[in-house]
């Protein structure tokens, strides 16, 4: 959250393509979360709302491990971070709960990164932060659209019958009109909006 602001409300909009019973029983495989915050604390808040997320493998393309660390104490689940930011800036050293990798340049490279770690980490939930590094849902070219659907189809083909679940974060901080959402390629699409106001603002009512 931006300094000097406080949360006043959290809104949800949901598009569910499979049966609602499946969603309530948490039998989804791919979940697209559209949010308007770059604050990791807000992401932690959402993860804590998920029933039984299990062990999390968090692939970060936008936040360094050091920037996320202060908020991990609030996370209820065990987490393994794959930091794709820090190695571009300074020398890094892996730890028991964090590994450093170059930033994937495409969704194909993202798939390779997932496959590299999924059997080692053995997570229940794989989080990709942020999907907006690969695609802009307000304007999708034919090439990008093809790459997106191939990636999502491959996720389903390989992991639909496994315990692994995928949470795809998409930050829409510019509040663009997202007219090209992959409604038929993911199980759930949820828009997560955090409303804020200045803490020093005086109510005039």
Label each PLM-derived region with a short phrase.
Residues 32, 125-129, 167:
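Structural motif
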Residues 54-135:
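Conserved inter-motif catalytic segment of the P-loop NTP-binding fold
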